[in-house]
Each structure stands twice: as structure tokens, then as C-alpha cells.
């Protein structure tokens, strides 16, 4: 058991320390509850806000090349994002997150999945 902290009262040093049931315990407990409630709601409200995205079926603007929903590389020419795919046309079936296939595709062997 750890030693009790020293407590100075009226100029004399004692080893008893403060009681667990002191009067200041009540407001400390109430402030602790209020802080927990505040932190809870601040995490719900204070998250990072991402900008709203326009649905894909609405035209306007030029779509940049990237990945479609299946992880394939897509082109981005034309209004509304339609255009030919600019990805490799060698039978690649890599998906985003499949690190084994990505590393095999980038290896010096030149093989990029089944052909």
C-alpha cells in the first residue's frame, strides 16, 4: 500500500491526509459529470465536416481519372465524367486494398495478374 501524502493543517504536519468524504467532494463530482456530458456531445458535434458531393448522374464539370467502385482505373475526359478507361488493359483484376496483387503488379517480373 502506498504511503499517504503529507497534509499541513494549522501549521502542523500530519500523515492522515484529507478524508474521502470531504465537503468539496460533492462539487468536484458534479463538475466531473458535467465535463463528461460536455465531452460526449462535443465529440458528436465537433467532428470533421466533409464537403457535400454532387451525385454522379448530374452533369457539369470535368471528372478526373481515378478509381471506379470496383477499384479499376478510370479515365476522366468529357463533360459529366464519361470517357474511355485509361487503365492497363492486361487482364488486371486488382482491387483497392489487395496489397498482394498490387505488389505483384509492380514487381520486376512484368506480370500483373492473370491474362
Swiss-Prot record:
It comes from Dictyostelium discoideum. It is found in: Membrane. It holds the Pfam family SelK_SelG. InterPro entries: Se_SelK/SelG (IPR024491). It comes from the Eukaryota. Residues 48-115 are annotated as: Disordered. The keyword Oxidoreductase does not apply. It is a single-pass membrane protein. The chain crosses the membrane at residues 29-49. One of its GO terms (biological process) is endoplasmic reticulum calcium ion homeostasis. Residues 58-84 have a biased composition (Gly residues). Belongs to the selenoprotein K family. PANTHER family: SELENOPROTEIN K. Keywords: Membrane, Selenocysteine, Transmembrane, Transmembrane helix. This is Selenoprotein K homolog. Residues 104-115 have a biased composition (Polar residues). GO terms for cellular component: endoplasmic reticulum membrane; Golgi apparatus.
